[in-house]
Amino acid sequence: MMKPEFSHFFGFCVYFLFLQVMASSEKLRVTTPTRHLLARVGGQAELSCQVIPPHSVMHMEVRWFRSGHSQPVYLYRGGHKMSEEAAPEYANRTEFVKEAIGEGKVSLRIYNINILDDGPYQCSFNDSGFIDVAIMNLNVTAVGLETEIHVQAPDADGVMVECNTGGWFPRPQMEWRDSKGATLPHSLKSYSQDEARFFHMKMTLLLTNMSHGSIICCISNPVTGEEKQTSIILANELFNQDYLWVGIFPFSVLSLILFGVLPFINSFFRSQGCASGCLSKCLPVVTSWPVQIVHFLVCSGVLFAVYLPHRYRVSLSDPQFPLYNNWITELLIVILFLTICFVLPITVLLLIKLSPTCLAKWEKNKDDIMDSQLGLGKAREASTLYEEQSRKSWEQEK
């Protein structure tokens, strides 16, 4: 039986069609081994892409770019880096890793990561008749370096504790905990971002007693789960309001005594007739209670307007924290000092101004008294002599 002459040709055609089908089933595509990458601020990140199935991309155009950016992060074309077309913010910070370029694997290494590098990236391969893109996301993280707890001066409501931290990205989670790990409700929480996009957080807590034991400020990064804790233990004396009266009562008594000095001085000088002319008009006004109180309040207001803002919040790391914490005693000392500084200068000025007049008055009064005493003595002698003469006359008549 004779074979057909076209059998070899037919087999070749079938084989060719089979290869075409296989080639179409193995169409090239771009993928990335990791779609989500983590990188710390100041560290480095490696964005990898590869062609599947393995295929040399040495003569392809490889581009990394970001949505919304007109310039690519990195551009590889014709076997060379196209630096002039890359975005300037990535200049001298990128490296093209091409050890496995013959297998279709390439990477872009970014150094000195900053917060602006956070976000999605796209990697594209372009060749005649082939183009494909893979997307990956770079998550940049930063953990704050310092956490401070500030304590406001206690008042009738309790003690306000404030936790401050900065240098975080993305925005961290904050909460107060007690010594048993239970979450405490915060009074206020706020945040801000600086020019470098770092987050700065502030959280406050109002404490009315020390039943919670130690107080812990917890801050955690929502991406990495890293957590930082700072704790404090406040003295029980801060929550004991009885000590207020220990300072307020003696201060009130002493203030009344000091404020009463000038009116008594005024009354004394007037009784002696020392004040005359302008002084007789000014002295009652200057030494009156309303003028003293207004002067004292004005001086106190000016002092506290300058003083209190500088000690409103005190860090536990401040070496003067024990001094600032005893604010009641400190406040009373300042007010007492103001009172003394108000009373003494006026008293001294009055004494200096009125002493010459009073001395003259006192000398005159002294002379009058002596004269009156001398006249009284003569009158007594005359009376005694008269009595003796009367007695002698009566005896003679008898």
Curated annotation (Swiss-Prot):
Q: Which residues lie on this side of the membrane: Extracellular?
A: 26-244, 310-331
Which PANTHER family does the UniProt entry name for this protein? BUTYROPHILIN, SELECTION AND UPKEEP OF INTRAEPITHELIAL T-CELLS PROTEIN 7-RELATED
Question: Its topology with respect to the membrane?
Answer: Multi-pass membrane protein
Which organism's genome codes for this protein? Mus musculus (Mouse)
Q: Its encoding gene is what? A: Skint8
Query: Which body tissues produce this protein?
Result: Expressed in skin, thymus, testis and, to a lower extent, bladder, brain, heart, kidney, mammary gland, small intestine and uterus.
Please list the residue ranges annotated as the Ig-like V-type domain: 26-141
The entry's localization annotation reads: Membrane
Q: Which cysteines are joined by disulfide bonds?
A: 49-123, 163-217
Phylogenetic placement of the source organism: Eukaryota, Metazoa, Chordata, Craniata, Vertebrata
UniProt protein name: Selection and upkeep of intraepithelial T-cells protein 8
Entry keyword annotation includes Zinc-finger: no
